Amino acid sequence: VSGDYQLAATYCEPDSGPGSILQILTHGIGFDRNYWDTSYNNYNYSYVSKAVDEYHYSTLTWDRLGVGESSKGDPLAEIQIFLEIEALYELTRTARTGKGWDICASFQKVVHIGHSFGSSITNALANTFPDSTDGIVLTGFSQVSAYVGYFALGGNFVPVTDIPALSHKYPVGYVGSYDSTAVHSNFFSPGDFDPAMLDLAIRSGEAASPGEILTIGAGAGSSNAFSGPVLLITGGT
């Protein structure tokens, strides 16, 4: 696959200026870059707010290819994890050099953080391009292959043409979770979340491509040769 694509991204830095470390944040399936910076409850659940305001990191959130304000593509043959890995690599190269964007900053280190499918992309980036990152954080991530099937089944994915909130935003071929039960099953542990957050996740949910869902395992199945720092955060049952 080859082509020209546009990525929608948001850069944040402390009031005092750029942090020495840039965190590049990659969201999972069913979300966009706002996953990392929700304004609900006065930004109480915003990762970006904590990272920037309290710990003085710079952050870069982006809509993965095929999602939100980034370029769309063929949802089966084009928008797969392999293209997403390359997109994250190019975004990282741009961020490191500062060329091609209006940010006057240079960073001592770049750390990549992922959620769910975003963690699979982050893991694969570190394995494929180990020099592109100084450390990775994987949340909602597992190398147990059985969970891929559970995710696909629990997601209750239907064509976007059957979801009024998404049908006007995505071309035919994309899919989305049909109801709150699906999102609850895949992302919210019973009794451990604010119910209003589940409602927000449904209202602001985004679509996915079948190509992504079918290639999730490619980002997690093999051993990783990356020798830098790794933090893995995955909830139990």
Predicted regions and their residues:
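Short, surface-exposed "cap/lid" segments of acyl-processing enzymes
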Residues: S16-H56, L60
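Short beta-to-alpha linker loops that shape the active-site pocket of alpha/beta-hydrolase fold enzymes
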Residues: I29, D63-V67, S142
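Alpha/beta-hydrolase active-site loop
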Residues: A77-C104
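Glycine-rich "HGGG/HGxG" loop immediately N-terminal to the catalytic nucleophile
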Residues: N34-Y35, D63-E78
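Conserved hydrolase catalytic core segment
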Residues: Q108-V144
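Alpha/beta-hydrolase
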Residues: F151-T237
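Glycine-rich His-Gly loop
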Residues: L25-F31, H115-S116, G235-G236
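N-terminal cap/lid segment of alpha/beta-hydrolase-fold proteins
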Residues: V1-P18
